[in-house]
């Protein structure tokens, strides 16, 4: 074998070895993938197994509960039948009692009616009712008379109130008149005071004149006519009369308030 042939054989062998290694790697990779799939399948299987066991447990519990419900339903049906029977018996007893009570009531009413008819209690009752009605009518008439008297009293009070109101108005008018007079007197008083002051000043001036002087005598008379004390007495009298009228008005207002 020549060297070139040997060299080609070596290259071909290496190429086969490389191809074998590549195939080996692919096989290993495929084995790993298969193992991973097997692992996932086993995990899924375990999960589904657990779920199945849980569902089986739930089904068993529900089946047990269903059995209990059926048992309870049967017991309720028996109890319902018993209650229905008792109800029917009670209804029959009630109807019988009702008939008996009705008969006793009719019998009692008949006995009462016969007794009343025998001793005339019904007529006595009617007579008592008539007497009560008469008494009530008499009471109502008395109340009506009392109301009439009260109305007359109120009318009298109303007339008295009107009279007091009229007197009040008259007193108010009289008070207004007196107040106007008082104002006039106050004006005259003020004028007299001014005149008095003027005359006093003139008096000082004429003190040196003879007492028999005609002008001096005239001034003295005029001074006495306009003395302040006299005007003050008139003012005080009017003021007293006004206060009396105001007091009278206040008393009448108080009396009207009490009447209302």
From Swiss-Prot:
GO cellular component assignments: cytoplasm; sperm midpiece
Keyword match Zinc: no
InterPro entries linked: CCDC172
Keywords noted in UniProt: Cell projection, Coiled coil, Cytoplasm
Coiled coil in keyword set: yes
Protein localization: Cytoplasm; Cell projection, Cilium
Residue runs in coiled coils: 13-194
Family indicated by similarity: Belongs to the CCDC172 family.
Assembly description: May interact with TEKT2.
The protein's name in its UniProt record: Coiled-coil domain-containing protein 172
Native source species: Bos taurus
């Amino acid at each position: 074998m020549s060297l070139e042939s040997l060299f080609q054989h070596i290259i071909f062998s290496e190429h086969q070895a490389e191809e074998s290694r590549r195939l080996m790697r692919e096989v290993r990779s495929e084995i790993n993938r298969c193992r991973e799939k097997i692992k996932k399948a086993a995990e899924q299987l375990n999960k589904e197994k657990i779920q199945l066991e849980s569902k089986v447990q739930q089904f068993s519990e529900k089946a047990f509960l269903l059995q209990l419900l059926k048992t309870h339903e049967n017991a309720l049906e028996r109890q319902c039948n018993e209650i229905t029977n008792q109800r029917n018996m009670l209804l029959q007893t009630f109807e019988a009692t009702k008939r008996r009570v009705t008969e006793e009531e009719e019998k009692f009413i008949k006995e009462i009616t016969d007794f009343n008819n025998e001793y005339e209690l019904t007529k006595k009752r009617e007579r008592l009712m008539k007497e009560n009605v008469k008494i009530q009518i008499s009471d109502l008439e008395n109340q009506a008379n009392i109301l009439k008297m009260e109305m007359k009293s109120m009318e009298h009070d109303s007339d008295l109130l009107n009279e007091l109101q009229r007197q009040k108005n008259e007193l108010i008018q009289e008070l207004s008149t007196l107040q106007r007079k008082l104002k006039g007197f106050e004006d005259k008083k003020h004028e007299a005071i001014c005149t008095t002051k003027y005359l006093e000043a003139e008096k000082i001036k004429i003190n040196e004149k003879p007492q028999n002087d005609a002008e001096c005598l005239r001034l003295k008379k005029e001074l006495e006519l306009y003395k302040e004390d006299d005007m003050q007495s008139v003012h005080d009298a009017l003021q007293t009369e006004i206060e009396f009228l105001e007091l009278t008005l206040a008393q009448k207002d108080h009396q009207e308030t009490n009447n209302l």
